UniProtKB/Swiss-Prot annotation:
Transmembrane segments: 163-183, 263-283
Compositionally biased region (Basic and acidic residues): 77-86
Localization per record: Endoplasmic reticulum membrane; Sarcoplasmic reticulum membrane; Cell membrane; Cell membrane, Sarcolemma
Record-given protein name: Reticulon-2
Region listing for Disordered, in residue ranges: 1-32, 65-86
Function: Inhibits amyloid precursor protein processing, probably by blocking BACE1 activity. Enhances trafficking of the glutamate transporter SLC1A1/EAAC1 from the endoplasmic reticulum to the cell surface. Plays a role in the translocation of SLC2A4/GLUT4 from intracellular membranes to the cell membrane which facilitates the uptake of glucose into the cell.
PANTHER family with a match to the protein in the record: RETICULON-3, RETICULON-LIKE PROTEIN
Keyword Transmembrane helix: yes
Source organism of this protein record: Xenopus laevis
Length: 321
């Protein structure tokens, strides 16, 4: 809230204290005539002590201070404005006060309505979920699950190296069915003895939704066709020597694979890859600083040797005398 207080000089008044805030009658005159609210606010003369008190920001409208009659020695009368210009100026001031009141009026702000925020969480893509599951498996986030997967895959590959695929599939199915049937019969027996509810111990896995929607199936098929077409195009460019440098690199790699095939078969190589996939990530995570240091040293040596070899190849041959 703001306050404005202004005074004007009055040389005829004996003191600044007055019972009325807006007028000083002339000498020998008494102001006994009552003034109604319809009349304008009496205008001060240049020689009267006046003051104006304005309050800004009040919620109630500005009201004009009441004018009381001043009693004196002589007969009272209302002091009239000597000029019409002063009267018009006072009207403009009153209008300005009203406009100022409307502008500075404080309006009560309605309380904020607290609304529940609805957050739409996008459903993760199947590829992202699979990648996250494989990463957790290789980094041994769940020790029991990682141990079971490594043991199962290793035993399967060892069996495939000694027996046929059909025999391994048949014996594997028999082992799994023997375990699940034993657990199911055990729960049925407990229910018959009233020591259990007889629920299926594999109900959680039975309730898991494994169905693919049409959109997901289309995405998987499109991704598979894209990968197959890219592989075929790459092999075509390598075998038909589209780029001589790439074809020579492919020739060296295939020649080295002949030596690998002479020592190991496909199952053994696959078994080594599985063991390395479950071993190297966790070892790198535990000794990351040392591994990065040695890798940087090896890369510097290789880059130095490559730059030296390229410099020798670009050097022009010496002229024969």
């Amino acid at each position: 809230m703001g306050h404005v207080l202004s005074f004007t000089h009055c040389k005829d008044a004996p003191s600044t204290a007055s019972s009325t805030p807006d007028s000083c009658p002339l000498e020998g005159e008494d102001d006994d005539t009552p003034v109604t609210e319809v009349d304008f606010w009496p205008l001060p003369s240049p020689h009267e002590p006046t003051f104006s008190y304005i309050t800004i920001g009040s919620s109630a409208p500005l009201s004009r201070p009441p004018v009381r009659a001043r009693r004196g020695l002589g007969q009272g009368r209302v002091h009239e404005a000597p000029r019409e210009e002063t009267e018009e100026k006072e009207v403009k001031d009153v209008v300005n006060y009203v406009l100022l009141e409307n502008t500075c009026e404080l309006k009560q702000i309605s309380p904020l309505q607290v609304q529940e925020e609805v957050v739409f969480v996008a459903k993760p893509q199947p590829q992202v979920e699979v990648f996250r599951a494989v990463k957790d498996l290789l980094y041994w986030r769940d020790t029991l699950l990682s141990t079971g997967c490594l043991t199962g895959v290793t035993l399967s590959l060892l069996c495939l190296s000694q027996f046929s695929v059909i025999s391994v599939f048949a014996y594997g199915c028999l082992i799994i069915l023997s375990v699940t049937l034993t657990l199911r019969l055990y729960t049925k027996l407990l229910h018959a003895l009233k020591r259990g509810n007889g629920a299926n111990p594999f109900q959680y896995y039975l309730d898991t939704d494994l169905k693919l929607t049409t959109k997901q199936a289309e995405e998987i098929v499109a991704r598979a066709f894209s990968l197959a077409s890219t592989t075929l195009c790459t092999l075509r460019s390598l075998f038909l020597v589209e780029e001589l440098k790439d074809s020579l690199k492919f020739l060296v790699i295939v020649y080295l694979l002949t030596y690998v095939g002479a020592v190991f078969n496909g199952i053994t190589v696959l078994l080594l890859c599985v063991i390395g996939a479950f071993t190297f990530p966790i070892l790198y995570k535990q000794h990351q600083t040392q591994v990065d240091h040695y890798v940087s040293l090896v890369s510097k040596k290789v880059n130095a040797f490559r730059s030296k070899f390229q410099g020798a190849a670009k050097k022009p041959p010496a002229k024969q005398k």
